[in-house]
Amino acid sequence: MDGSRRVRATSVLPRYSPPCLFTGHLSTKSNAFCTDSSSLRLSTLQLVKNHMAIHYNKILSAKAAVDCSIPVSVNTSIKYADQQRREKLRKELARCEKEFKLSKSAMQTNSKMNSKFFVNSLQKPSGEPQDQDVFIEEMTRYPSFSKSLIPSSEGLHLSLPESSKMLMSGTQKHASTSPSRHSGCGHGCDRRPRSAHQFQVALAKTPSGDLLEKHSDLFSNKQSPFTPRTLKTEAKSFLSQYRYYTPAKRRKDFSDQRMEAETQTELSSFNSELGTAEKTSSKDSEVNINQVPNYTRNGAEDKIAPLPSQGQNLAWDSIQDGILQQSSERASCKLSTEFSPDSKIYSDEEELLYLSFMENVTDEILKLGLFSNRFLERLFERHIKKNKHHLEEGKMRYLLHGLKVDLGCISEEDPAKQKHFRMLNQLHFQKALISRENEFVSDEETVSHHERQQYQEALDMLSAVPKDENKMFSLPGEFLIPAHKVKHSEGVIIQQVNDETDNEASPWNENNPSVSDSVIDQETSVDVIEGDSDFERAETSRELCCLSTSLSPSGPFPSINGGSNHGKELSTLRIMGMSIED
């Protein structure tokens, strides 16, 4: 029994223990709890050792009642294999990040030493000989230089600050004078492997800060303020199709305005241009006499009477009563034409409205304190839009144009454009001045035009002589008026009066069938009567022109071949009526 137990015990001895006897602290002999003398024997110690080994083997070989091992399907699953591979890659990335951080900190600590060493090497005089192989070997001692070599000295491009760039340019000049040094460097560099990276010096990074400080060489004008630019496109928003969407209003582009900063709040920039603008405005303020309307208003009568023709070429000062005066040099911001108090077209109330309009504009400019051209254009357009329903837009624009001249906003570079703008405003304002008068003048002009036309037609009809085309003989003292159709014609009455007649009767015979002229110095009087054009249109035909010729009493004509008309007396001519169709 003991033998079999001993053999069994020896069969389960642990693999990690040597088969030799226990000595030293492993035996129970040196144990403080050993009190029995029998335990000091070697056989007892071996039995205890075997017993404990068997006990631990049983514990390690024990199995759970529930199988918790990994199933076979998991090991054969592709999804599980991909999951394990991703976990492995994640661990590798974490390890690489740790190594990169450590190397980065080491590079930062050594960067200053590297830069100082390289700058000192560049500052050496060109006369001293320097071995390029030794120089490269010294630089490869540092970790920042160990990964980069250069195939030739001509490919050396370093990212240095401006001071280092100046030194680098100096060394390149000295290197060009000594070609032997380049050849030596080329032979020395050819010994290096071709797989090496390009040589670069790792300097300290640019310190964090403003872009203007980092890249100051890329910005030309640092004093100009930052003005964001918006992309102007003709594309329309999709929301414009929505019934409740109100699109943004586009600003009108003025071609003659100058681009200035919105934040300009001082008048110092306008002081230099103010004197020159006054000189140019005084020259442009001269008004051409031909452009001024040749009409004046009478105080007693509400009619327009044209000025005499010889007064058109006179100067402004020669016109009496102060109706029109020559504009002064500072009249660029005022009206170019002035009227006397008795011939004013605009009332005092309207002038007060214009004065209040200019006062509101100037008050808002002074309140905001902005004097840029863009701001002034916006302000003027807003006030014009606000007051255009009860004030003349042309006069408002002319007054605002004068205000811009006073502020010096109009440059002297384009005097032609300035003069053209002033002439347009003057014409617009003059058109507004005579807009009311044209209503009264229009009827009178049409009437006078028709009168002149009908008078000329009557004279043409009187001077017309019957031709052969009529194929008829006219009686003495009778003449025919050809039919003439005139639209909207007036009524004309023509009378032929005999001032002097011959009392003696002229003989009538076959040889001389015509009657001798018994009428001397006949006068023809033409009376022009105004007619109503509307009434003429209503009637389709009307007798407008009547011709009557009266002769003084004369002797009877002698009979022709003893005819019955021997005692007949011709006193008057027949009245011919001519109907003029519309």
From Swiss-Prot:
Keywords, in A-Z order: Cell projection, Cytoplasm, Cytoskeleton, Sensory transduction, Vision
Gene Ontology CC entries for this record: axoneme; ciliary basal body; microtubule cytoskeleton; photoreceptor connecting cilium; photoreceptor distal connecting cilium; rod photoreceptor outer segment
Main location: cytoplasm
Protein origin, superkingdom: Eukaryota
InterPro entries in UniProt: SPATA7
Polar residues bias locations: 169-181, 262-274
Entry's localization field: Cytoplasm, Cytoskeleton, Cilium axoneme; Cytoplasm, Cytoskeleton, Cilium basal body; Cytoplasm, Cytoskeleton; Cell projection, Cilium, Photoreceptor outer segment
Entry comment describing in which tissues the protein is expressed: Expressed in the retina (at protein level). Expressed in the choroid region and retinal pigment endothelium, within the photoreceptor layer (at protein level).
GO biological-process terms attached to the record: microtubule cytoskeleton organization; photoreceptor cell maintenance; protein localization to photoreceptor connecting cilium; protein localization to photoreceptor outer segment; visual perception
Annotated region (Disordered), positions in chain: 167-192, 251-289
Gene inactivation effect: Viable and fertile with no gross morphological abnormalities. Knockout mice show severe early-onset retinal defects and progressive photoreceptor cell degeneration. Significant and progressive reduction in response to light, accompanied by progressive thinning of the outer nuclear layer from P15 to 7 months, loss of Spata7-interacting proteins at the distal CC, and destabilization of the photoreceptor distal connecting cilium (CC) microtubule core.
Quaternary structure, from the entry: Found in a complex with CFAP410, NEK1 and SPATA7. Interacts with NEK1. Interacts with RPGRIP1. Interacts with RPGR. Interacts with NPHP4. Interacts with NPHP1. Interacts with AHI1.
Stated role: Involved in the maintenance of both rod and cone photoreceptor cells. Required for photoreceptor-specific localization of proximal connecting cilium (CC) proteins RPGR, AHI1, NPHP1, NPHP4, and RPGRIP1 at the distal CC, a photoreceptor-specific extension of the primary cilium transition zone. Maintenance of protein localization at the photoreceptor-specific distal CC is essential for normal microtubule stability and to prevent photoreceptor degeneration.
Entry protein name: Spermatogenesis-associated protein 7 homolog
Organism from which the protein derives: Mus musculus (Mouse)
